Amino acid sequence: MKIYTKYGDEGFTRLYGGQRVSKTHVRVEAYGTMDEVCSLLGVIIAEIREDEKLNDVLGKIREECENIQQQLFDCGSDLATPDGLREYKQTIDDVKWLEERMDEYIPQLPKLECFVIPGGSRMSSMFHLMRTSTRSLERKMIAVIEANEGINKVGLQYINRLSDYFFVVGCLTNLKLGNNETIYKRSAKIFRNSK
């Protein structure tokens, strides 16, 4: 397998199907950001796996994150595919799977009414970093839509839920590790319908 092609030396790449585009094309920006999100998640997975205490407490979440990496690659593949060239890989089942995970975890969390400032533990903060990186990916995907480029709308739903998942898992991580959340002191009550 040849890693370098020299094709990108002039600032261009190819989408699925062969269309030549600039490396600053909205699709390339979106799937490049997806790759960043997936890579950052790999750091979290490795850190949990390598720390016996973390793996004991967060092993299930680590396994979920490994599955999420697979789903992120499906999302990236769909983003690299101009609309209609092939069937999309990401499905509504991926969205439902994330919702089921959150529905399982949210009842375990203490009542939350205000904004949370990332902290409490390094791992919780890493999940909040995942949340914000995922929101960045979501904005890049919206830019693809605004550029009149067709995308898998299920992928956008998935990324929206994924950010929520990382928020929930960040809070759950602090709970499981015995750390308190840092509440934004000037926050109005915003989660009125939460547990």
Task: Show where each model-derived region lies.
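Phosphate/pyrophosphate-binding loop motifs in nucleotide- or prenyl diphosphate-using proteins
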Residues: 1-195
